[in-house]
C-alpha cells in the first residue's frame, strides 16, 4: 500500500509498534480512497504482548487522533483474516440534492445542485443488482488482469428530509466502483440517462460509458459482513 505513515493503518501500526517493540503490519478488510469514511472498518494484526485486548484498545484510543477510534478489540483465532474472511460490505452514499446542504454535515454529505428523480434511479439500480462485469464502473486500468466480475446483492435509494441515501451491499467492489455506480445513477436522476441504459453500459466494459466519479466525502463504509 506504499507509504502508510499518514493513514489510519499507519497511525495504528506506529502505536502498536511502540507498544510491542517490534514491527507491526495490519490487515484491513479493505482499502478506502482518500476522503472516504469508514464507520466500521475491521482489521487483524499479530503482535506479541502481555496486555489484554481491553488494555490494547484503551492504549490505542489514548494515542490516536480524535477522528480515529477503535470501537472494539478482541483476541481472534490464529487463522482469522479481516479481508479474506469477509463475505461482503455495506457502503452508504449521502447526497443533498437541490436544496441548502446541512453545513454541519458537509464533510459527510455531497451537495448536488440539481433535484434528482429517485424513482428513475431506483429503476436503474434494479439492473445493477446481481452478478455482472463492472469494469465500466471502475477505475481499473487496461492492464488489470484480475476478474472484474462482482456481485451486488442490494441497492436501496431512500429520500430523507434533507438528503438522499444510497445503500449498496455486495460481496466485493472494484476501485472507485461505488462512487462511479452512484455517479451513473445520479445522471439517471438528472434525466441525462434512461434507467434501462444500465445493461448496455455494463456490456461496453468501457469506463467512458459510465457516469462521473462522485466526490469521496459522501461515501462511508458502514459495515463489513462476515
Residue ranges, per PLM feature:
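Structured-RNA-binding interfaces characteristic of tRNA pseudouridine synthases
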Residues: 1-226
Amino acid at each position: 500500500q506504499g507509504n502508510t505513515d499518514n493513514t489510519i493503518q499507519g497511525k495504528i501500526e506506529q502505536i502498536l509498534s511502540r507498544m510491542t517493540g517490534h514491527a507491526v503490519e495490519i490487515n484491513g478488510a479493505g482499502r478506502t480512497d482518500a476522503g472516504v469514511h469508514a464507520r466500521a472498518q475491521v482489521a487483524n494484526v499479530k503482535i506479541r504482548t502481555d496486555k489484554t485486548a481491553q488494555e490494547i484498545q484503551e492504549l490505542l484510543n489514548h494515542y490516536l487522533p480524535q477522528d480515529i477510534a477503535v470501537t472494539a478489540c478482541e483476541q481472534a483465532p490464529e487463522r482469522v483474516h479481516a479481508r479474506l474472511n469477509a463475505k461482503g460490505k455495506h457502503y452508504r452514499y449521502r447526497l443533498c440534492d437541490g436544496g441548502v446542504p446541512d453545513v454541519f454535515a458537509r464533510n459527510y454529505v455531497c451537495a448536488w445542485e440539481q433535484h434528482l428523480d429517485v424513482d428513475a434511479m431506483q429503476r436503474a439500480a434494479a439492473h445493477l443488482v446481481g452478478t455482472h462485469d463492472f469494469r465500466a464502473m471502475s477505475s481499473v486500468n487496461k492492464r488489470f488482469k484480475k476478474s472484474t466480475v462482482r456481485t451486488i446483492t442490494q441497492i436501496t435509494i431512500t429520500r430523507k428530509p434533507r438528503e438522499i441515501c444510497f445503500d449498496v451491499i455486495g460481496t466485493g467492489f472494484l476501485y472507485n466502483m461505488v462512487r462511479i455506480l452512484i455517479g451513473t445513477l445520479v445522471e439517471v436522476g438528472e434525466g441525462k440517462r434512461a434507467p434501462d441504459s444500465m445493461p448496455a453500459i455494463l456490456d461496453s466494459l468501457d469506463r467512458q460509458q459510465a457516469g462521473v466519479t462522485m466526490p469521496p466525502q459522501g461515501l462511508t463504509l458502514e459495515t463489513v459482513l462476515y
